[in-house]
A protein has these predicted regions:
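Active-site helix-to-loop segments that bind/position phosphate- or nucleotide-bearing substrates
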Residues: 2-89
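Internal, well-folded beta-alpha domain core
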Residues: 86-242
Length: 242
């Protein structure tokens, strides 16, 4: 059983560094493509300010020259979802569950265990980077599929641009989750609520060592309860009263 979570744009490097691992072949190819861009080209590529582009250029060059500082991925990323995941003061069994089941999907590193070393970088599957003539999605498809080959239960907390990297065969196994708010009888989906809920849901999975869809259906967390009337076999819907 594996749980997939995406990367985030926000990062926090206020953590102790850890030792880097050698880059996979696929990751090196992506890095080589990124390293061709000048700082001013990155400004256009990332659609960011000149100052931000300079920062990203420095990150890419540091990775290329093996100077980059690395951090556990789950602690490096600091978006809204990540800030709602229990990342510190885990019990031994919670830590073991996290290490065994939670995977981060990255457009640079591939699919890796949540505490794998990562260096600060900015890349997602909506970016139009060509790697040896292929799109990022095409470049990663077989490695992404291979990482989940043989897994029967796959919980996806990914957005659609990450899910579509996988083949149909893998996607058909994925259990997805929807988090909604009930405002006076009106069900609403809100990006902020969804991101916070994904983090709180993952925390509940970790704390209760969930292994099956049946166990996931029984969860109540952060005001959310499972709604069987809105759910299907492969999409579980949780609703919170506003």
């Amino acid at each position: 059983m594996k749980i997939l979570i995406p990367t985030a744009k926000e990062m926090n490097t206020d953590h102790p560094c850890i030792e880097a691992l050698p880059l996979k072949e696929e990751s090196q190819a992506v890095l080589d493509s990124l390293a061709h861009y000048s700082a001013s080209e990155l400004e256009t590529f990332y659609k960011v300010s000149a100052e931000k582009a300079e920062e990203e250029y420095a990150h890419i060059q540091a990775l290329k020259d093996h100077r980059a500082k690395h951090y556990p991925a789950l602690k490096l990323f600091d978006g809204l979802m990540y800030r709602h995941i229990k990342r510190d003061k885990l019990t031994e069994t919670e830590q073991a569950y996290l290490e065994d089941h939670v995977l981060i999907t990255s457009a640079l590193y591939g699919i890796v265990p949540a505490l794998s070393p990562m260096a600060p970088h900015r890349l997602d599957f909506l970016m139009k980077l060509k790697v040896a003539g292929k799109t990022l999605k095409s470049h990663w498809k077989s490695a992404y599929d291979e990482a989940l080959r043989g897994e029967e239960v796959i919980f996806s907390l990914l957005s659609s641009e990450f899910e579509t990297v996988f083949s149909k065969e893998i996607r058909e196994k994925m259990v997805t989750f929807k988090f909604m708010e009930d405002k006076a009888g009106q069900l609403k989906i809100h990006s902020t609520i969804s991101k916070k809920a994904r983090g709180a849901f993952l925390t509940a999975l970790i704390e209760r060592k969930v292994q099956t869809v049946e166990q996931a259906r029984k969860l109540s967390f952060a005001g959310f309860d499972y709604r069987p009337d809105l759910s299907s076999d492969l999409e579980l819907v949780f609703v919170k009263q506003a």
